[in-house]
């Protein structure tokens, strides 16, 4: 009896030791909260169930991924205005199967031609993300109609029908939207049109589940449909062009500009009439057989590519998933990428970015050698990509070169007041779609949201405040310039595997977007056997988040040395990271901002997989 008891004690001790070792090597794989979503014909994942269902409906009616994507952008701009409104921006990547290439559509608005740094400084104004001072031209609708015109098959009337219905007849409000309204109530009450838009006629707030209507927004969309109808006899493209022109060049634009000028914003009609969504080649890198495409250096998207190039120099599988080594090298690679982002990334219409050097594998190898596996870096220093770039030989703007980050109590206080979890107050959504033919639509729309956008009179359009991502600093590459686009955080991603369509992925989360995408992508491709076929497992695994950079949003706070970690990571792993010098804040399960929405084509079966992050109420469907 005594020997049996001793054997049990020894067995328990061995088991405890093994559990501790397993925790240090990586997390345990647990069942996902959401079931596998798989189908043969298509997959959709988006930030709201109504957005997902709108895209799904278009696919069922015979539309392609691009028709469905535009329908989702329009519906999202009605029902997700705590995250994104139609006066905001939409960054899009498309993969038309007949073209066999990825194309980038930059629906990011530009600053008015009269907006200069001196204009703001002389008036003692800043770019705080509320009101009209940080306003830029709405870009989302131009991008949406550009996609529809070039790659879609349906009319604007077809794809806008559900958005008009929800705006005119109403839809039920979700709790998240109510929370945002309550949080932003002071700002809402500053602007009469915002108050009429977001509050009941008696000034009280709606409750979750209540029906809300936006008749002014519905009317704007119907005016665009009327313009299309008047020109549809000239062809589908002519009709779509007429709808777009009515918004940017016609009576809708005139109303918006009159409102802006009345309130002292430096816009004129030409800022709208001459605006265009930029259509261009994306940038890309290859990571172990996967080709990852991102928007060019006007976005933070290439930071993901830089981090992957750095990580290719390490044996991630050998380290073990979510082990201390694995998370440490991810954090450190992101620090290096962010230092380059904050130095070199800017509007390429105004700045010659050393893009070739930044994405060079040789440069990444040099950067990887900066990583000390035993200690967290407390520096914030950009690399020098110029020797690896055949086009750029000189850099005259500010360069990150801070040798030692001191603890800053003011910064620490700001972190506790919202900066500690980037993207929780500023918001965004994402849409990922793959259809039966293999066409892919991937978009990250944002801006025009409740908390910052002024409703422009009876147009129902909430004006984007993305200008807060400029710097009012003439030494910075990403400074404010007339007709320039801010270096934005929005970052869709398309991945090909051996040249074939494989994955579309994106997320909200501000500066954190690349971190969510990076960790989810690595979960999918490096640890495929641990989750397949339930894509939700790869999405739900716990994450970390470094704050070691200048925040893109005004006033560009910093979180140097700070790391967030979800509490579902083993405590031994968190302690091991702390011993290396990472200053960890432990958040609740699913506590890191972001909501990865993903669609995937399984190359071995041809099945379409879809997944949506439980960190918010994103929703996925396949059929």
Language-model features, listed with the residues they occupy:
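Bacterial N-terminal signal peptides that target proteins for export
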Residues: 2-18
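Alpha-helical support elements that line or immediately flank enzyme active sites
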Residues: 58-59, 142-150, 244-249, 508-536
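Internal maturation/activation junctions in enzymes
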Residues: 202, 235, 253, 265, ...
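Active-site rim segments in enzyme catalytic domains, especially the processed small/beta chain
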Residues: 79-95, 99-103, 263-268, 413, ...
């Amino acid at each position: 009896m005594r020997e049996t008891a001793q054997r049990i004690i020894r067995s328990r001790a061995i088991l405890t030791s093994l559990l501790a070792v397993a925790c240090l090597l990586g997390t345990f794989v647990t069942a996902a909260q959401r079931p596998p979503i798989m189908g043969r014909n298509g997959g959709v994942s988006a930030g709201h169930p109504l957005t997902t269902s709108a895209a799904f409906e278009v696919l069922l009616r015979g539309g392609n991924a691009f028709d469905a994507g535009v329908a989702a952008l329009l519906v999202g701009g009605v029902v997700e205005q705590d995250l994104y409104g139609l006066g905001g921006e939409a960054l899009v990547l498309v993969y038309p199967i007949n073209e066999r290439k990825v194309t980038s559509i930059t629906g990011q608005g530009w600053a008015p031609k009269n907006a200069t740094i001196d204009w703001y400084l002389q008036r003692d104004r800043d770019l705080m993300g509320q009101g009209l001072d940080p306003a830029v031209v709405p870009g989302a609708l131009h991008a949406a109609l550009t996609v529809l015109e070039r790659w879609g098959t349906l009319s604007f009337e077809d794809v806008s029908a559900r958005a008009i219905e929800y705006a005119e007849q109403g839809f039920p409000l979700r709790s998240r939207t109510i929370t945002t309204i309550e949080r932003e109530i002071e700002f809402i009450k500053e602007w009469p049109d915002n108050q009429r838009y977001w509050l009941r006629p008696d000034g009280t707030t709606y409750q979750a589940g209540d029906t809300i209507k936006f008749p002014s927004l519905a009317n704007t969309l119907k005016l665009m449909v009327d313009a299309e109808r008047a020109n549809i006899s000239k062809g589908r493209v002519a009709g779509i062009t007429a709808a777009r022109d009515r918004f940017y060049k016609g009576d809708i634009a005139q109303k918006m500009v009159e409102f802006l000028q009345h309130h002292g914003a430096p816009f004129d009609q030409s800022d709208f009439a001459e605006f265009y969504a930029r259509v261009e080649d994306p940038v890309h890198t290859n990571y172990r057989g996967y080709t990852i495409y991102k928007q060019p250096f006007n976005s933070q998207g290439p930071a993901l590519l830089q981090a992957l190039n750095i990580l290719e120099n390490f044996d991630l599988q050998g380290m073990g998933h979510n082990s201390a080594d694995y998370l440490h090298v991810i954090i450190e690679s992101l620090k290096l990428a962010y230092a380059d982002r904050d130095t070199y990334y800017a509007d390429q219409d105004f700045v010659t970015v050393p893009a070739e050097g930044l994405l060079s594998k040789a440069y990444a190898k040099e950067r990887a050698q900066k990583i000390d596996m035993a200690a967290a870096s407390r520096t914030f220093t950009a690399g020098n990509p110029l020797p690896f770039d055949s086009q750029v030989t000189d850099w005259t703007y500010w360069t990150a070169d801070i040798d030692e980050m001191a603890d800053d109590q003011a910064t620490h206080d700001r972190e506790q007041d919202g900066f500690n979890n980037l993207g929780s107050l500023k918001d965004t959504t994402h849409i990922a779609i793959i259809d039966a033919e293999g066409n892919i639509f991937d978009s990250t729309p944002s801006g025009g949201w409740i908390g910052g956008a002024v409703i422009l009179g009876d147009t129902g359009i909430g004006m984007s405040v993305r200008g807060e991502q400029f710097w009012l600093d003439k030494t910075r590459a990403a400074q404010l310039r007339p007709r320039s686009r801010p270096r934005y955080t929005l970052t869709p991603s398309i991945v090909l595997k051996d040249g074939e369509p494989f994955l579309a992925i994106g997320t909200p989360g501000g500066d954190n977007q690349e971190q969510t995408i990076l960790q989810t992508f690595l979960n999918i491709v490096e640890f495929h056997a641990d989750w397949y076929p339930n894509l939700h497992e790869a999405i739900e695994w716990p994450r970390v988040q470094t704050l070691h950079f200048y925040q893109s949003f005004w006033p560009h706070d910093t979180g140097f040395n700070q790391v967030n970690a979800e509490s579902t990571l083993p405590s031994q792993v968190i302690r091991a990271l702390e011993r290396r010098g990472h200053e960890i804040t432990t958040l609740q399960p699913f506590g890191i901002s972001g909501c990865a929405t993903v669609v995937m084509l399984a190359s071995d079966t041809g099945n379409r997989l879809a997944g949506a992050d439980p960190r918010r109420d994103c929703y996925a469907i396949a059929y």
